[in-house]
Structures are given as C-alpha cells and as structure tokens.
Amino acid sequence: MLGRTLREVSVELKQGQITPTELCQRCLSLIKKTKFLNAYITVSEEVALKQAEESEKRYKKGHSLGDLDGIPIAVKDNFSTSGIETTCASNMLKGYVPPYNATVVQKLLDQGALLMGKTNLDEFAMGSGSTDGIFGPVKNPWSYSKQYREKRKQNSHSENEDSNWLITGGSSGGSAAAVSAFTCFAALGSDTGGSTRNPAAHCGVVGLKPSYGLVSRHGLIPLVNSMDVPGILTRCVDDAATVLGVLAGHDPKDSTTIQDPVKPFTLPSLTDVSKLCIGIPKEYLTPELSSEVQSLWSKAANLFESEGAKVTEVSLPHTSYSIVCYHVLCTSEVASNMARFDGLEYGHRCDSDVSTEAMYAATRREGFNDVVRGRILSGNFFLLKENYENYFVKAQKVRRLIANDFVNVFNSGVDVLLTPTTLSEAVPYTEFIKEDNRTRSAQDDIFTQAVNMAGLPAVSVPVALSSQGLPIGLQFIGRAFCDQQLLIVAKWFEKQVQFPVIQLQELMDDCSSVFENEKLASVSLK
C-alpha cells in the first residue's frame, strides 16, 4: 500500500479499500522503523492522527475534499507550521513555534492532507548534502537497498559496512528520503539553486521546481528571495502535477505570485513526441560529468530522436559565469535575510547583558553554524559600498544575460531542454565531507542554479541505476509558466524508462508487507 503512488492510494481511499487512519498509522510505523535515516526532525503523530480522523469522517459522508484528502505528506523544516516547531535545522530557531502556516502548507491542509512531520535539511537550506544541520546528516535510503548492497557484495565490500552510507543530496534531503523510503506520498522541499532536484536525483524520486511566481513563498523562511521556490518531491510525475495543481496560484501575501487563477490539472498521456524539439545545451558537457551520467544523457536524447522528436544541440553561452554569479547574488541576499535573526523578536537569544551589540554578536555566533556565518560574511563583503558596483551590480547584469540565453533558446523553437541533474550518483558521506560546504555546493549546483536565476520550471526524473545500483536522474527545463507542458514531456519520458522501485526488504524484513506488491521494472536506457 505505501509503495503505491499518491493518485493510486487516493482512489483506494475513495473506494474504501483503506481508511485515512489506517494509512496514517502505517506511515507512522514506517517512520519509526526508518528513524535511523534521520529524515524527520519532528514527527507530528498526534496532529496527523487527528487529521486522519477528520478525513475519515468526510469519506464516510461522501464529502471528500479531493485527491489529497487523507494522503500523508511531509514538509521541509524551513516552512512555517502553526503550532509545530520550525527550526531550519539551526540553533537559531530551535524551539521556535510559528503562529501561522506557510501558504503552501495551508493549501495542502485545506485539501485534507495529513502532516506526518517536518523533514531534515542543511542549516537554513545552505548546502547540497543535507549534512550540515544541527540534527545530524540524512542517510540515503538507497544505502540500504537490495540493489546497492548486492553491487557492493560483487565488489567485495562488506554488506554490513554502515560507514559507507550515502548522502541524500540537499538541501531538501529529508524530504527526498521521506518519499523514497515510503514514509509519505509527497513532500515539500525548497529550491534556491537545486535543493529539490539534487536530492531527488540522488534518492530516485521526482523533484519539481516550479516557475518562480507560480507558487507562494509566504511562510518559507527566506534564503534568497529572488530565487527561492517551494519544491515538490513525489514518486512519479503525475503525483507532482497533482500537488502543483493544489499549490499554484495567486497569494495576496506574496506579491511575486501570478495574478491569474490556476486550476488543478491532470496530465494527459503524450503518445506522439514527433512535434517536440528537445535542446541539449553543449556547455553542460563538463569534464567533471561522470561517464555513466553522460551515457544516460546521450541515450535519453537518442530515445526522443528514435520516437520522432527533433533533438538539437543548443548554446547557453554565459553558463561558465553562472555559478560565480549565483554565489555573489546568493550570499548577498543571505546576508540581508539573516540580519533579522538578532535575538530580539524570536529565536535564540544570548544571555549577554554587556551591551546590545555584544548580545547581537553572541546570539549570532551561538545561533549560526560556520557555513551560515561564512555566507553572511561573503555577502556583506559584496554589499560594501566600495564593492557593490563591482560585484553585486555586475552579477545582476550577468544574471540577466543568463536568463536571456534561455529566452533565446526557447525562441529558436526548442520546447524543452534535457540536461543532467547532478555530476554523478550519490557518494558516501565519508567522501562527501572531505570538501567544505562551499566547494561541494559549487560542484553540485552546476546544472541546476541557472534555472533559478532565470525563474524557469525544471524537473528531475529518475532514469536508471548506475553500475553501483544507485539512482541517476536527468533534468528537464521548460519555458517560464509552461510547467504543465514540461510535466507532460517528463511523464512520457518516465513511462519509457520505467525506473525500478527501491527494494528495502532486507532492511525491514518485518515490514515486508509494505513492499510485497512492488515489482522490479526493467530499465530501458541501460
């Protein structure tokens, strides 16, 4: 049951094959069994069971609120949740309980979704591994999959060697792990430079970054206001579309959202791709790209071509400047946004009574980790009067050039861009932490951050397993506010590749009934 898609289990709820309470209890049981993954910071068991009880009453009366009624979901812990602690995985906000819900959270609850809990992340969403929060790193469920462990056996590695568990990617690693491990059917992440798509690729799930302005940011604790977007993590493209249909639309509390109303939609099944033009950005073929990802990228392009689509190489000439441009703009906005955490209104406050200035300094020293403090320092440097024109203003100009590159490509007749999501599959934690956060983020955001600067929709779709038995994802990028068209193409591709279901039986042999109906599908691109 828990291995099914959101839409499938929604049908079973409506038919009475399972009740919301039974579904909720199964998810809660699995959350407890997979606690070692560290996917959740807070498990809202009482809240979820109460919501399930209310959902059950509606179903009995025949008054279902829609496809999300009674569906267990999880929310990244940088979205405000009324009455539930919201920490951003930081000492600065540990113990902070917001008095309101983020708009996206409220929209899900209004549709009857069950909030299972708040998921783990890098502190204030600054990172690409979900390793730097105060609650510890998130473990990738695929570390314990039958597929990965069998490959390790073949390579003479110890099957029980837990020191080589894999990172989830970040910063929405908790949400990706929660969906991948079947503890919920959908989860909210945030995406500033790839923080939803990166962990989606590493955890073998779908990660959608909507167009900037399509989904409200109200209640998302800001990192970079001009790039932050609530992200969606699900096990299939159809489910991502279902959640997007609920979340999208104008919000008077977020002036950047679109004015036009957005209706929920169901993705049609595309049968003919011959009229599509798929663009392959030549600048994304970098020396650091693993041979396996490169091979799958090429095979995916060939798949479209073999079905009649036009596949053409395109140029995004300012790509080489994008990661530096992103760093300048990101840290500058971080410095501005983090200024609100001064110990006066909410969050952590140091006991220092020497002076107000001393209290500010001590509060921020105790509340923020080295990564956050480092980004604040970088941002303040770029915003200094003597540096403002040479760094911040120039970066804004380069950002416009990067956005124009995408506009020019789409105006040339390209419908969708096809790129890698990450340079390689997930790496072991011990290998990941050999490099500092900033270096890792610069490497891991290489294919994803330009989309945020351009405000475009993008989705990472799992494609196949690597030779190590680990997921690899590819990214589709669409025109601004053409999210539905993007998802239609992604759905067609998903159907062709038939990504295999994660096999966790060996890990949870006492929970085999959860997975007994799942079949290992063949992978057509391997």
Curated annotation (Swiss-Prot):
| Family in the record | Belongs to the amidase family. GatA subfamily.
One term of GO molecular function: ATP binding
Gene Ontology terms describing biological process: glutaminyl-tRNAGln biosynthesis via transamidation; mitochondrial translation
HAMAP family found in the cross-reference section:
GatA (MF_00120)
InterPro entries per UniProt: Amidase (IPR000120), Amidase_dom (IPR023631), AS_sf (IPR036928), GatA (IPR004412)
Is Lipid metabolism set as a keyword in this record? no
Classify the source by domain of life. Eukaryota
GO CC terms on record? glutamyl-tRNA(Gln) amidotransferase complex; mitochondrion
In terms of SUPFAM superfamilies, this protein maps to: Amidase signature (AS) enzymes
The question of whether Ligase is a record keyword is answered with: yes
Q: Which organism is it from?
A: Bos taurus (Bovine)
Q: Assembly and interactions? A: Subunit of the heterotrimeric GatCAB amidotransferase (AdT) complex, composed of A (QRSL1), B (GATB) and C (GATC) subunits.
Chief subcellular location: mitochondrion
Going by the UniProt record, its keywords in alphabetical order are: ATP-binding, Ligase, Mitochondrion, Nucleotide-binding, Protein biosynthesis
Identify which residues the record assigns to the active site.
76, 171, 195
Q: Which Gene3D superfamilies does its entry note?
A: Amidase signature (AS) domain
> Which gene produces this protein?
QRSL1
Described function: Allows the formation of correctly charged Gln-tRNA(Gln) through the transamidation of misacylated Glu-tRNA(Gln) in the mitochondria. The reaction takes place in the presence of glutamine and ATP through an activated gamma-phospho-Glu-tRNA(Gln).
The record's catalysed reaction(s) read:
L-glutamyl-tRNA(Gln) + L-glutamine + ATP + H2O = L-glutaminyl-tRNA(Gln) + L-glutamate + ADP + phosphate + H(+)
This chain belongs to the protein called: Glutamyl-tRNA(Gln) amidotransferase subunit A, mitochondrial
| Annotated segments matching region Disordered | 147-166
Q: EC annotation?
A: 6.3.5.7
What is its subcellular localisation? Mitochondrion
